[in-house]
Amino acid sequence: MPGLVFGLDRGGSCRGVVYRLAGDQVPTYFPALWDREMSTGAYLPRWINCSTEAGPVRALVFIMNRDNPAYIRALPEAELLAIVRRAAGRYGPCTDYVVQTAQALRAAGIHDARLDAIARRLEQDSHALPEGA
């Protein structure tokens, strides 16, 4: 069952992490990155200017393709949770994706109140399951 993904959309901003690949690492890591982000047509690649603590950098980002039929701008929380709870993809359960994203952002000092609330609800679900379920 398809799930939901986080994506950059035009008209906003994003706090996150910028990764640098050394030139000799590009052939090793870039094909898998490109395949993961571009295989469904849900994203469009764009070079943008980013501000970092070390100064400005150009970065390749993958923004939402609003023309893709899977594009969803916003959902009520109850509907979002229902989809996430039942969905899984080639990288695992959607619940893990949401919770791990929230944990990674918190570890990087980035706090998103809505995402944190959703992740807490999903974590509570997992604690309510009987042992071995």
Regions found by a protein language model. Give the residues of each.
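Glycine-aromatic micro-motifs
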Residues: 1-133
